[in-house]
């Protein structure tokens, strides 16, 4: 069960709320890796609910760099609704092949009229805010290994909350270049730090772009990671 659907269960939506929510969700769409769901400067007219694959929000700098400001995993929604009708100050791009649905602005407004569904969007927004605060602390206060360890823990915790982990393994498709855009390090520094973490026996790479965490406590300690700070559902 993906995170947004996990939240639906957690907030005790009635059958009518669930029916209304599903009725206002658009058809499933699929796009290739690198495709844009939205671009900086565009007016936000719909919300994107990620079904399969990963996407990211990023900023385009004048020097051509594209620092990633947040990750969108299956079950995540691109905005809690507060950004509707405003110009985006970021872009959204698929970093793997992506499957998603949309909720247009008119449908979103109708959904917000239902108190429990409004709470659902607010809860999703609270999680996004908590993750963003964790990223700020990660970049400003941790060393290279700590930043990467924290990111690995965060993605595992978010995947676990969405029911997408198995025996310590989870899908982690980020390239070293993309990791560098998340944690603010060079690709070379990322490579060295990842190798150090692997040599410590904390993680190992698996097939199909998966990672296995062999020592959760050790990895969490290295990254000073605390899952409760992300406000994820139990």
Predicted regions span which residues?
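Cyclic nucleotide-binding regulatory module and flanking cytosolic helices
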Residues: 1-33, 76-78, 82-85
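Short loop/turn microsegments at loop-to-beta-strand junctions
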Residues: 26, 44-45, 170
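Conserved catalytic Walker-motif region of ABC-type ATPase nucleotide-binding domains
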Residues: 31, 50, 213
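Cyclic nucleotide-binding regulatory domains
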Residues: 35-97
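A residue-level structural signature of the nucleotidyltransferase/glycosyltransferase Rossmann-like core
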Residues: 47, 69, 100-101, 171, ...
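Cyclic-nucleotide recognition modules
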Residues: 70-134
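Polybasic "coupling" helices that flank or enter modular domains
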Residues: 119-184
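Phosphate-/nucleic-acid-contacting segments
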Residues: 158-234
């Amino acid at each position: 069960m993906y995170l947004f659907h996990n939240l639906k269960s957690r907030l005790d939506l009635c059958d009518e709320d669930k029916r209304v929510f599903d009725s206002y969700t658009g058809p499933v769409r699929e796009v290739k890796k690198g495709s844009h769901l939205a671009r900086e400067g565009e007016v936000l007219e719909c919300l994107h609910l990620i079904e399969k694959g990963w996407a990211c929000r990023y900023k385009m700098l004048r020097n051509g760099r594209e620092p990633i400001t947040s990750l969108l995993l299956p079950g995540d929604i691109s905005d809690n609704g507060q950004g509707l009708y405003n110009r985006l100050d970021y872009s959204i791009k698929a970093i793997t092949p992506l499957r998603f649905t949309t909720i247009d602005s008119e449908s979103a407004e109708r959904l917000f009229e239902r108190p429990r569904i409004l709470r659902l969007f607010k809860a999703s927004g609270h999680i996004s805010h908590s993750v963003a605060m964790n990223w700020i602390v990660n970049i400003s206060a941790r060393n290279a290994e700590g930043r990467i360890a924290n990111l690995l823990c965060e993605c595992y915790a978010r995947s676990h909350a969405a029911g997408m982990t198995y025996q310590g393994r989870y899908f982690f498709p980020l390239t070293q270049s993309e990791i560098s855009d998340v944690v603010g390090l060079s690709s070379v520094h990322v490579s060295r730090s990842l190798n150090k973490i692997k040599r410590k026996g904390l993680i190992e790479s698996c097939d199909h772009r998966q990672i296995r965490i062999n020592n959760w406590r050790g990895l969490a300690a290295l990254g000073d990671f605390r899952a409760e700070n992300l406000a994820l559902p139990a």
